[in-house]
Curated annotation (Swiss-Prot):
Gene Ontology biological process terms from the UniProt entry: cell adhesion; osteoblast differentiation; positive regulation of bone resorption
Subcellular location: Secreted
The protein, known as: Osteopontin-K
Source species of the chain: Bos taurus (Bovine)
Alphabetized UniProt keyword annotations: Cell adhesion, Glycoprotein, Phosphoprotein, Secreted, Sialic acid, Signal
Tissue-specificity statement: Kidney, liver and heart. Weak in bone.
Amino acid sequence: MRIAVICFCLLGIASALPVKPTSSGSSEEKQLNNKYPDAVATWLKPDPSQKQTFLAPQNSVSSEETDDNKQNTLPSKSNEDPEQTDDLDDDDDNSQDVNSNDSDDAETTDDPDHSDESHHSDESHQVHFPTDIPTIAVFTPFIPTESANDGRGDRCGLRTEVKIIEVPPINVQSPDATEEDFTSHIESERCMSTKKTSRLTDHSKETNRCELSKELMPKAKDKNKHSNLIESQENSKLSQEFHSLEDKLDLDHKSEEDKHLKIRISHELDSASSEVN
């Protein structure tokens, strides 16, 4: 049980790591090896003591892989050239021969005097697992295509930025302008000038009104004062005349009373004298 658990652990580790395929693989695997040679740096090297337990599942995996490769290559034979199909068939036959030789070598691993060549063949066969090779994106550096301006002193490598001065657009009147446009422009200018003059006149009128109002205010105050003086004088005159009339009436009334008294006295004297006689 322990050996089986160890085998499953090793299989999981081996399937997780990118592995270089053997030379007996299909043409697609060879093309992948040629495109990505850096993925070969991480090879799996298990212990030689566990080869017997490890090679039994490998043979079954390799046979399944060859069957899958055959199935993948069969539908594409109609589109490929006959020379390419012959090459693929030769590669498959070679892979089957190599797998049979590897199985024979695996049976002879029980001998103590096993050569180093069998060890290397076992390792090469052991590495044969269908793993997804990681794709490495190749970034090409940016190379400027502009010509070098040596005469001016600029260098394209330094990527000097040239400041662009933006010139404001100038409205140039074309000589083909019609008279109507010209007259409309003149009329608009006249309207603007009349508006400005009307504003100026309105402002001047307002200022004149303010000045006149300021000048008329003290004059009105003086007139009010003069009218008040005249009214006071007239009132005083009227009061004096009224008092004088009252005095005259009093005098007249007194004179009339005196006359009546005198008449009475005279009548009494006359009556008294007649009685005496």
